[in-house]
Amino acid sequence: MTKFEQYFDYVKISLASPEKIRQWGERSLPNGQIVGEITKPETINYRTLKPEMDGLFCEKIFGPVKDWECHCGKYKRFRYKGIVCERCGVEVTESRVRRHRMAYIELASPVTHVWYLKGSTSYIALALDLKVKEVEKIVYFHSYVVTQSNTDINLKYKQLLEGYEWKSLEEEIYQNQDENNQVEVGIGAEAIQKLLKDLDLEHIAETLRSEATNPPKSFKTPSLKFNKKMKRLRLIENFIATGADPSWMVFTVIPVIPPDLRPMVQLDGGRFATADLNEFYRRIINRNNRLSRLKSILAPEIIIRNEKRMLQEAVDSLMDNGRRGRTVVGANNRPLKSLSDIIEGKQGRFRQNLLGKRVDYSGRSVIVVGPHLKLHQCGLPREMALELFQPFVIHRLILQGLVNNIKAAKKMIQKNESSIWNVLNEVIQGHPVLLNRAPTLHRLGIQAFEPILVEGRAIKLHPLVCPAFNADFDGDQMAVHVPLSLEAQAEARLLMLAPHNFLSPATGQPIIMPSQDMVLGCYYLTANNPSQQQGSNQYFASLEDVVMAYEQKKIDLHSYIWARFDGLVDGDQPHDPIKIEKHSDNSTTKFFNNHIIKEDAENQRIVQYIRTTAGRIIFNKIIQESLLA
C-alpha cells in the first residue's frame, strides 16, 4: 500500500482551473507518452469484453483491469512491473490504480457549471450583476449580450438583445464600422466566459466598498439593491482572497472520475449493468464529438448553436440531473443518478460512507432500563462484550498461561469454556466503553460508562442519563465503542464518564434529573393514602422493623404507624405539644401531631417515636444510602 508522508493542516474546497482539471487526469507514461483525454464514448468491446482504447474504461488512461497484465496480454506477471507495452500502450501495474486515476474530456465549446448558475444563489449572475433569467437566456441561446459596447449605436455593455434586434442592428453596425469603435456581441457560455474574464475584481471591490460606507438611511428595512451589492462585494472579496478566477465557473474541460467508482459488471444472462454516470459521460462525449465535426465542416451557425445547447444540457444533467430542464431517465423511467445525487442526502457519499463508516470494535443493540446500575455503569450483554474485548481476552489468556497462541485462544472462546467469563470480568474492570445514540446532536450524545456483564442481548442503561441521550425505552438502539489505547481510555474516564457530564452544555442547567417513573415512584412512596389502613397505629422498635413488617405484608405501604427514632425530627408542625402526660416517676410524655417524646425528671429524652409510613422510611433509607455512598 502506498503511504504519503505529507502532513497537512486543513482541506480546502475551491474552484478548479481548467489547467488543474487537466493535471488531475493527465499522466506521462514511462515511455514519455501523455495520456488522460477521453475521446470515444465506447465502454467495453462486447466480443472480447475488454475496455475500448480512448474510451470511458480505457486501460491506457486508467490502468490495467487485471493485476500486472497489459491489454493485449503480451506482458503478464509482477516481474514486468512499470513496463509500458509497445503494442497496446498499457502500463503493467496493479489494477487498483483504476480506483484513483482520473481523466478528462476537452470540450469543443465552453459550458457553464449548473451549480453556479441555478443554485440557491446564482454566483454567475451575482458576479456579473445581471438577473438570473438574463444569464439563463444568454447561456441557453435565447438572447445575445453585448461584450464590447459602442457609443455611436447606443449599445450598453452587458445589454441583452433578442435575435431579431441583433439582426436589424447587424447591417447598420458593419456598414458604419470603424476600427476604433468596434462592437462585439456574444451568445452562450462563451459570452458568459468572456464577461467573467473581463471583470476587474480589484476595481469592482473598491467601488462596492465605497458604496458600503454610505448605506441607505433606513437601517430597519435596507433596500434589496444595497443587500445585493453587499452580497456581490462578499463574493468578489472571496474570489480575490482565494485567487480563483470567476471564469472558472465556466467549464472548458470536464473531469472524469475513475472507472472503478462507476463500474460496469456482467450479469448472469450475459447482459451488463452499468453505473448511471457512464450514460451521462457517453452523452457528453457523443455531443462534443458531433460539435467538433460540425465546426470542422463549417456547418450553419444555427446547427452549431443547437449542438452547443445540447452539450450544455448534457453537462448540466451530469452535474445535477433535473436541476434545470428535463430530467434524464433510464430504464423504467427511473431518473439517472448524477454527481450531485451521489454526494448529497442521507444516502450520499458524505453522510453514508464518510461520516457513517462502519468501525471495528463496535456493537449495536436495543436499550432497556437498568435501575440497579450506578450512574457510571451500563449493562453490556456477555455475548457482545466477549466479541468486543476479544483481543484483550486473548492477551490475558496467553499471559495467564491458559493457552500458548492466538489460535488456541480463539478455539477456547468458540467452545465457550467457563474460564473465559472469569477472564472477561478481569479484562473489563476499569476499561470504560463509549455509548452513542444517533442522532448525536450535542457532545452528551456520546458518553463513557464502566461495563457490567448482563444476561440477554440488550444493553442496560441508567435511567438518569436518558435526557442527555434523548433516549427512551420503546425500542431505541445504541452503539457501543471500545477505546483501545491507554490515552483513549484515560480521556474517556476523565472527560466522558457520565457523572462528569451532569450539566447541559447548551443551558448550564443540570441534565441528570429524575423524571417520569422516578418522580412517580418518589411521589407514590411518600404520598398520603387513607384507603390503606392495614396495621395502622402500631408501634415498632426501629425503622428496620417497619420495613420487615411491610415485606411480610403485616402493614400497608401507606399505613401510618409509630416507629422508634433517635435522630433529630425537623418538621413544619407547631413546637408546642398538644398533650402532656406526667407519670409517677416524674417522667413526662409529650404528644405532638407527628411524634411522641418521653423525658425523665431532668427533661432528658428517654425515647422518641415518629408517626410515618413504611413508604417514607424506604424513601429516606434510599436517599441516606445514596448520600453516604
UniProtKB/Swiss-Prot annotation:
The keyword Plastid applies. Disulfide bonds: none annotated. It is an enzyme of class 2 (transferase). Its EC number is 2.7.7.6. Mg(2+) binds at D472, D474, D476. It catalyses: RNA(n) + a ribonucleoside 5'-triphosphate = RNA(n+1) + diphosphate. Zn(2+) binds at C70, C72, C85, C88. Its cofactor is Mg(2+); Zn(2+). Keywords: Chloroplast, DNA-directed RNA polymerase, Magnesium, Metal-binding, Nucleotidyltransferase, Plastid, Transcription, Transferase, Zinc. SMART domains: RPOLA_N. GO terms for biological process: DNA-templated transcription. It holds the Pfam family RNA_pol_Rpb1_3. Belongs to the RNA polymerase beta' chain family. RpoC1 subfamily. This is DNA-directed RNA polymerase subunit beta'. The lineage of its organism: Eukaryota, Rhodophyta, Bangiophyceae, Bangiales, Bangiaceae. The gene is rpoC1.
